Every structure is written in C-alpha cells, then in structure tokens.
Amino acid sequence: LSDHLTLLATDGSKRVRLMQAARAQLRLPPAQVLEWRDWLRQPSLLDAALAQPGMFKIEPPGDDTAAHLHLLHDGCRLLGRPPVRDPEHGELLLMDTWFAGFAAAMEGLASQLNTLPQTRLVNAPAEIVAMTDKLACQQHLAAHGVPVPTLLGPVHGYEHLQTLLSEHQLDRVYLKPRYGSSASGVVAYRRNRAGRQQATSSASLQRVDGEPRLFNLKRISRYESESEIATLVDILAKQQLYAETWLAKPRMGDSHYDLRVVTIGGQPAHRVARIGAQMMTNLHLDNQRGDATSLLGPADMAALETTATLAASAFPHSTLAGYDLVVRHGQAHVLEANAFGDLLPGLMWQGQDTYTAQLRHHHEQ
C-alpha cells in the first residue's frame, strides 16, 4: 500500500487514533499529523509536510479551541465585523463568521496544494467547503438530480418564519443553521390551528447575565412558549438559518430512524441506521445504531444505494463522504452531506472499518 499519508488534524483526536490503528493493522507507517493550529499560524509547514509524494487528508479542527478561535477571528476580519468575545464551550455563536474564516482557510489551502502536484487528495478543499455550507450543499445536490427535502430558503427571524409557514400552508418544518454540524442548532418546529407551538432542538437556551445564549447539548430540549421559541429562532437566524419541509422518518416500534451511508470512491459502502425516539437521530445524541440490511427491504436498499451513488457523483473530487438519508416506500432523500462523515468506530463493511476501507481504496487506485 502507498506508504505516506499526512493528516491536517488534531493530534490525539478519535479520528487520528482510528486512522493510526487502521494503518498499523495494514502494517503501514503512522500517518504524519500537521496540527490545524500550527498550519493556520504558519502555512509553510504544509509545504514541508508534503515534500515527499503521498496522500493528504483534511480532517475537521474538532476539539482544537485555538484553531476554531483563529478561524472565527479571521472571519470577523474578512466580514468587516468588530472583534468578538470568545464563545464558551459548546456555545452556538457566530457560526456564519466561523464559516467565513474556514472557507478562506480552505481557499488558501487549495492554492498551496496547487503547487504540490505530487500530493493526492482524499477530499478537495473546495468540496469540503461546499458540504459545510448546508444550504448551498442541498441546492447543489438538487441541481444534480438528487432528491432532497423541499427547501423553503433562508429564515430571517421568528416573524419571518410565521410568514413563510403561512405562504407555504405548512404547520411543521425543520430549521437548520446554514453552517452547523452534527445537529447543532437544528430545530424541529410545529404549530397547530389552536395556536400551540413546539420547538425541539439540541440547542439549550440559557440566560447568562440576563442575555439569552444558546449552547449545544447532547440532549434534546423542548420549547412551547412563544417568547422562548422566538428567542431561539432569532438567535439562530442572526447566524444564517434556513427551512426545509418536514420529512417523516420510517418508524420502528416507538422509535424512528434515518440512515448514514459512507461512500468511498463514489460507491456506497458502510451504512448504519440511526434509531431514536426524538426528532434528531444523530448517534452522538445517545441514539442507537441499527442494522440497515435488516431494516430495509430490497426496494428501499436499492433506493439507498442509487441515491447515495448519485449524491457522491455531485462531488467528484471527494473520495469519501457521509450522507444522511430518509428511505421509505422505495424512495430515498438526502438530508445532509458530510465531508467528514467517516467517524463511525467499529462499523464494518465487507470486513473493514471506514478507515481501513479508505486506505485500501487508495492503494487500489
């Protein structure tokens, strides 16, 4: 197998540990790790790291607070915004500003990589950015014929949400931060004719020194008062929020599920059902894994594979991606694409985890 792999990552993170374990299993030398924070401070470190031919994989900054703050402060500068206080741990703050810094960093990285033709990329920076902008990503998938939930466009605040619902004659929608990840800030909103409403989210609304703030928690919160829901939506809308139609997920007993499929080299590989009683079925929210093969009949499995393949073809310069799908009645819709969707410890496909499978794929190429 190809010997040399460099990761732009956070050393010691779960992603790095799983990749190093896969390399050890295949009797490959450990991957070289370039820390995000170091590269952001001194981009020339990348040129040195990639001096010899090999593979290069971009992982997310993860738990590297210094890297996230660097991106946030770069975003402020690029958008002409005044310097901001540092977000507290888990706080949903200035996601759009962070994204501006992240997109600029990826653009700079792409320029650097253009001078290093001997380096083979796992995922191209431009496509990582495209998948991180959730609204643009869904529009991109739809333009390539991939079925997605109907997009209702940006939401500018609570009052605008009410207008949108009335215009489209809807009483329930999903609200998603344009630059969020892992269900952070996603809101399942519904109202009825009697005027009652409910918002369900992993975003926890807290008051700090009298100021409302949002924190991403690994548990679901429910809001039923108009003032709390309006505050929740308004805070998220300031960071760019969009709405999409509510797609019912198939049920299994008292729970419902969607599916994560990892594509490698454009082909569907690892797949897992994400089963939960709550609206959000993300696995990090204490939901359960389920066996996709036992849950899906032949027509649904065919729809899953066809749709995942079509979605992957919309990102031809991404060897690897995770897609979240709702599959029912022989139809599949893509809820989200994730350029970093391979963090599924222990999930096997044809006897290999996601990290071993991607290393083998690169060797075969």
Predicted feature locations:
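Short, surface-exposed charged micro-motifs
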Residues: 260, 322-324
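PAS/PAS-like sensory domains
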Residues: 23, 241, 318-320
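Phosphate-binding site of ATP-dependent enzymes
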Residues: 165-282
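Short, flexible loop/turn elements at secondary-structure junctions
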Residues: 9-12, 38, 155, 179, ...
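Conserved N-proximal alpha/beta basic substrate-recognition cap immediately N-terminal to
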Residues: 10-155, 159-163
